[in-house]
């Protein structure tokens, strides 16, 4: 069984037992959270598609850790002016462990 969920403006395909990194969620480490924006749930023989979400569809997950991703380096350059600007960015993430998928 797998599901497609939406969190942080992105969509993820998850199964029970998966570990994935999503945009930062304000929850304590070790806490259990419920993701209720479920777009699709599929078994071996049955597929449910929401319009836009499945009524009563829920995915339970445990927050494993919080952190910051790899650094992305940006260089802006103005040609012929000897002007350069270097910047970097590290995005915050939350690592989740998927415990249960239910259709309601």
Curated annotation (Swiss-Prot):
InterPro entries: bL21-like (IPR028909), bL21-like_sf (IPR036164), Ribosomal_bL21 (IPR001787), Ribosomal_bL21_CS (IPR018258). Keywords: Ribonucleoprotein, Ribosomal protein, RNA-binding, rRNA-binding. One of its GO terms (biological process) is translation. One of its GO terms (cellular component) is ribosome. Transmembrane segments: none annotated. GO terms for molecular function: rRNA binding; structural constituent of ribosome. PANTHER family: 50S RIBOSOMAL PROTEIN L21, LARGE RIBOSOMAL SUBUNIT PROTEIN BL21M. Part of the 50S ribosomal subunit. Contacts protein L20. Belongs to the bacterial ribosomal protein bL21 family. This protein binds to 23S rRNA in the presence of protein L20. NCBIfam families: L21. This is Large ribosomal subunit protein bL21. The gene is rplU.
